Amino acid sequence: MNNAVTKIAKENLADLVTFAPRERFEPTDPIFKILPETQTVICLGFRVLRGIYRGTEEGTTYYQYTTMGVENMEETIMPMAQLRVAAFLEEKGFLALPQRRHQQIMAEPNSTNPEVAYDAVYRGKSAEVQLDFENTAVKCGLGGKGLSGAILTSDFGPFVRYCFILTTAKLKPTPLQTPYLCDGCQECVKACPGKAISKNGTRDPWQCAVYYNGANGTKNPFMPPDAFADLPDRTSIITGNKHLTPEQARKVLNEIYFYPPAQHAYQCSICGRACDTACYIHLEQNGLLKRKFKKPFRTREPWQFCADDFKTE
């Protein structure tokens, strides 16, 4: 059965397929609230093309990451693979329940999802039970958790998205991966254009949202010189040195009109997941990734603009 599931998933563009038995999860885990009869959690991992990140690296094209690396993955490619695998399992007489990220539904009352417009998020919806995606991925043997919280895989590093299927079928488990990729190098922390990741790996979702959307002018080719002219501390905002409260973050986000959003409320990533890119480069430089390329990802010093370009006086 494992081989058949893996074959169907890979025929539908999944790159990694792993399995976790129910015994790996605590009795209070959300999977048992969603489907109490769950016997196996299937994890489907999908590479985000390395080339998609090149646009931000070169400062030449940004829409490709958001549309091809996020929106189409989450809304088209990944659900199709889930549905095909789930249909196969149900044809065999087992229940199968796909689980994808709820990009616009949150249990937290005052958090946000940087990938979507903050005013499109429905907060405080605790009645909608959701998986802890990162911990579930680890328990499925997909990879290990990095300092920033990203799942790191030996094939693609952090350049991966993933989803799950809960099923009543008992399938052979994938061994847990011994964490070895993250060495605590802090490259993800240093790379964030808004200092949204602390040294211990805690991520501020509102700070992340502001700079994911491009509030750091030194890394945003679309920002006009008079951006945020009516906001206090605009220079600190533009250079990524201003720590923003959720209320302040909303005000900044209301003034970010640098680039059009995609469908389904997905915001264009101007930072291009700088944290993940820095992590990938570090893993590649240290020879820790299985998949090799003819040239290294980074071939020269990263570009940036001067903060003086945004002076209004």
Residue ranges, per PLM feature:
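C-terminal non-catalytic accessory extensions
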Residues: 286-313
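Short, solvent-exposed secondary-structure capping/transition elements
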Residues: 53-54, 97, 288
